[in-house]
Each structure stands twice: as structure tokens, then as C-alpha cells.
């Protein structure tokens, strides 16, 4: 499934479970597009791929690109021109009954997009800014904020 606006095109890659979840989340995906459009400052339209991956795959990516040999929740990769990729570990978004948790899914998507659009959390101020934007996004799409104020 793809979502598109003047600033970016996002393609989601995953199994049939993800496709079903995305079809049931069209309203939130539309709001995702609305929320992130003004935060994306690149003049060119950006192509973004968001892929749900296994723990083994994200661990391998984390080791290769960040030199950390451990599983993580989300990784973002930008080529600085007009595209980017986000990998999300399935273990961080699946409920015990193996369905996708909306809260976790949209939080990690927002976190990855903020990184692609130039935001970071390397110090207290940047972490506070990022958490604020993540909380505002979650409220905007009708979900609970994930960070305490």
C-alpha cells in the first residue's frame, strides 16, 4: 500500500497481515500524511519505504550500519537526496495474539519519519522536541501519547 502527498510517497512492505491492518487504518494513514507534510522540509518529493522485518533482519541491519549487535525497534536510513527507508522489527508491533498493535505501529512509524526528516534525540533538548512531535502525532491520529509530559 502507498500513501502520497506533495512532499512524499510512502510505500509499506510486509505480509498480508500488514496489508489488512493498513486497509483498516486508512483514516489514520491519511492523517499521517497530513501531519508529516509540513515537517518535511526537502523541496523534492521524497520516496520512503517502510518495511516490517524480523528480529534477525533488524539485528543484522543494526550491526552493519550502527555497529550494535542487538535487536532494536526501528531504524531509519536516508540517502540525503530524495528517498529513505525505515525498518521496523515485527516483535515491537505485534500483540500476543500476533495482530498488529496500532499504538506501537504508528509510534515507530512516526519515530522513523522524524529521523528521515532530520530530527534526532542525541541530547536532552532534541529528545524533548522529538517526543513532543511524536505525542502530538499520536493525539492527531486519535491514539494515546506515548511519552509522559
Indicate residue ranges for each PLM-predicted region.
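An acidic/histidine-cluster motif and surrounding catalytic segment
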Residues: 1-108, 114-149
Amino acid at each position: 500500500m502507498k500513501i502520497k502527498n506533495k512532499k512524499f510517497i510512502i510505500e509499506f512492505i510486509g505480509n498480508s497481515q500488514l496489508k489488512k491492518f493498513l486497509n483498516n487504518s486508512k483514516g489514520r494513514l491519511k492523517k499521517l500524511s497530513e501531519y508529516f507534510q509540513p515537517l518535511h522540509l526537502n523541496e523534492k518529493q521524497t520516496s520512503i519505504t517502510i518495511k516490517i522485518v524480523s528480529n534477525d533482519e533488524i539485528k543484522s541491519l543494526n550491526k552493519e550500519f550502527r555497529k550494535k549487535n542487538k535487536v532494536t525497534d526501528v531504524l531509519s536510513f536516508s540517502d540525503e537526496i530524495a528517498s529513505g527507508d525505515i525498518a521496523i522489527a515485527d516483535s515491537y508491533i505485534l500483540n500476543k495474539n500476533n495482530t498488529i498493535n496500532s499504538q506501537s505501529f504508528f509510534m515507530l512509524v512516526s519515530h522513523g519519519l522524524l529521523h528521515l526528516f532530520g530530527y534526532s534525540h542525541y541530547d536532552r533538548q532534541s529528545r524533548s522536541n522529538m517526543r513532543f512531535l511524536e505525542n502530538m502525532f499520536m493525539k492527531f491520529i486519535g491514539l494515546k501519547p506515548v511519552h509522559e509530559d
